[in-house]
């Protein structure tokens, strides 16, 4: 994820985020005797960045790199405003997940980076056409956790950039759907 911010805590010049796994695994792969298996995925159906994988899976989580509103066929920014750009970001995320046979509703966290907070209403319109995605998710009104960050600048002057975290419940390496166990989705929307 690349973005510009106007100020960082304590006047820092750089802030970095890291995600670390202790390598012990989770259901269904625990214990892994300390072996940490990481699976990297790239598909030509979404934009490819030579500096990062489209997704990296470990344990039962899959972290997708933030998607810009790029046409995967050309690698260029799509035409249009924030509505079209948000739609393309989500289409790119969906293409990455489809390339791994992971349903869109397995997304547990979405981070949306906007240049202008006033665009949030338009982004929400597009967002609701993607979530919930399946009949099961609609039945329980499942939507992932979401954070919106206002950035003072995004790569290629994009208006929006979206990243996602998936918990597909099948471990790493992925297992057949019929072999999954221990994953229960309960939405508590009150």
Predicted regions: what they are:
Residues 1-91, 95-109, 113-190:
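N-terminal presequence-like segments and the immediate start of the first folded domain
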